[in-house]
């Protein structure tokens, strides 16, 4: 008798087996220079977010739970080595802490904050090169992105957090390559990860902080699933298309077209968008259009009578994006397109400080005067492009408008600048330069785990401050 977890369901090849075989067999040297460069930029961007978010409550809470162990994995910006699952959890929460993490629009998921913490935590336990770590991450992004494209709809994303749904598969496949599992073991890890899909979007309606912990749950679960598979645990191969598998359970429909990784040699990581500001992905292009409008309005926002925002249906439908207040927490403001646009118009800038002005009377006046609509053309172009148009009617009856066909991503120089500032504030300028140099040449590194050690506080023995007893 053969258990399904160790073979195919009913004697037929499953979608999971085909996907896992492709993920595990992708050659380390099979990715183009452009793909590798994008992966390194995403890695640096992730680290910049993790360093900058260290003082925030959710980052501190996650770090406080990390259990010190000998020869463990390191937390970004801390000194103590911890259990790999604890490190993955804390580093994922910190990477998500600013709401500036990278974004894959087609899956509506933040893949970097589940993939990189898993890869870096495991790279300290299992000896892999930088090239192997980069390839593992690229495969992880690809896995999450392709599954996400197949399953995520605006209706599903209204209830479930896409990062929590597809992230476990992404992190498990990235980690399987670092750990060195064989295909059957990786398939079992993949199936186990399917049982860790979770994350509800109620936080977007309340502003509560559970959102920040979603990637942490994913990364920690992925490490656990990999350990279980390595020890012989089995899982359902039909986890994707089965009667009670991922697609029927969450999408309420069967799996359609088979999911293929790297079709025609294209890598999904190249479709990842690096945010210029710490706010919801869907608020980025409307705020950028609003900034162009603000620069054309003489005398400031007090001359504005009304605001009209046109963008994609996905943006309008995503939980929290159409919120008009009241805003009790900055997270609610970061999710709200009307708030983001109003704050940009009122302050003439897109900045983190905008989202601290929850009681600003002028921002509130503009939010109340705002109409948010889905535009058919922008909707048709999504997710390849994320367009937006902002039209303001002035009190004198004239109008000012600006439109973007697509969001403007943070560029290489911006990502490097904010990494340097954040890392240097924690570790000093010399250490920050060493980290950046290692990331730049990561494909030549003989020990990928050295990067995680570089990101830790050198020589520190004190564990993260604990606020919750064990």
Roles of regions detected by a PLM:
Residues 1-108, 205, 210-220, 227-470:
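Terminal-appendage/accessory-domain detector
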Residues 11, 15-19, 61, 131-140, ...:
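Extended, well-ordered alpha-helical scaffold segments
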Residues 53, 119-126, 172-178, 225-229, ...:
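Well-ordered alpha-helical scaffold segments within catalytic/enzyme domains
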Residues 94-149:
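Hydrophobic alpha-helical hairpins/lids featuring a short glycine-rich hinge
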Residues 112-120, 167-174, 219-224, 283-285, ...:
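Well-ordered alpha-helical segments within folded domains of soluble proteins
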Residues 125-137, 180-187, 235-238, 298:
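Structural helix-adjacent loops and short alpha-helical linkers that scaffold large soluble proteins
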Residues 143-169, 215:
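Aromatic-lined, polymer-binding surfaces characteristic
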Residues 192-200:
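Flexible glycine/proline-rich, aromatic-decorated loop/lid segments
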């Amino acid at each position: 008798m053969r258990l399904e977890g160790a073979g195919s369901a009913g004697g037929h090849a499953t979608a999971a087996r085909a996907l896992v075989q492709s993920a595990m067999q992708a050659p380390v040297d099979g990715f183009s220079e452009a793909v590798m460069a994008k992966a390194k930029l995403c890695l640096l961007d992730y680290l910049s977010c993790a360093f900058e978010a260290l003082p925030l409550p959710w980052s501190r809470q996650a770090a406080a739970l990390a259990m010190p162990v000998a020869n463990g994995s390191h937390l970004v910006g801390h000194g103590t080595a911890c259990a790999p699952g604890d490190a993955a959890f804390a580093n994922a929460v910190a990477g998500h802490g600013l709401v500036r993490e990278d974004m894959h629009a087609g899956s509506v998921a933040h893949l970097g904050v589940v993939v990189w913490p898993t890869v870096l935590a495991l790279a300290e336990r299992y000896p892999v090169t930088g090239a192997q770590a980069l390839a593992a991450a690229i495969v992880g992004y690809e896995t999450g992105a392709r599954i996400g494209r197949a399953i995520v709809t605006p209706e599903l994303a209204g209830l479930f957090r896409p990062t929590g749904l597809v992230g476990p598969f992404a992190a498990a496949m990235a980690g399987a390559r670092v750990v060195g599992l064989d295909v059957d073991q990786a398939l079992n890890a993949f199936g186990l990860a399917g049982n860790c899909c979770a994350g509800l979007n109620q936080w977007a309606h309340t502003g509560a902080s559970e959102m920040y912990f979603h990637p942490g749950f994913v990364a920690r679960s992925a490490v656990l699933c990999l350990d279980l598979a390595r020890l012989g645990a089995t899982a359902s191969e039909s986890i994707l298309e089965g009667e009670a598998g991922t697609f029927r359970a969450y999408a309420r429909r069967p799996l359609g077209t088979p999911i293929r990784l790297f079709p025609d040699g294209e890598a999904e990581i190249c479709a990842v968008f690096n945010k210029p500001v710490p706010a919801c992905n869907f608020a980025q292009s409307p705020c950028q259009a609003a900034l162009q409008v603000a620069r054309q309005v003489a005398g400031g926002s007090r001359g504005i009578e009304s605001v009209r925002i046109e963008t994609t249906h996905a943006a309008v439908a995503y939980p929290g994006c159409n919120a008009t207040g009241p805003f009790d927490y900055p997270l609610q403001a970061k999710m709200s397109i009307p708030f983001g646009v109003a704050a940009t118009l009122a302050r003439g800038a897109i900045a983190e400080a905008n989202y601290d002005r929850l009681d600003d009377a002028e921002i509130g006046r503009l939010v109340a005067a705002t109409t948010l609509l889905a535009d058919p053309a922008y909707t048709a172009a999504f997710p390849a492009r994320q367009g937006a148009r902002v039209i303001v009617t002035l009190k004198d009856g004239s109008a000012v408008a600006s439109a973007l066909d697509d969001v403007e991503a943070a560029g290489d120089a911006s990502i490097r600048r904010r990494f340097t500032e954040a890392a240097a504030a924690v570790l000093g300028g010399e250490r920050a330069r060493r980290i950046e140099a290692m990331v730049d040449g990561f494909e030549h590194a003989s020990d990928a785990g050295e990067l995680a050690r570089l990101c830790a506080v050198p020589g520190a023995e004190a564990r993260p401050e604990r606020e919750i007893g064990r």
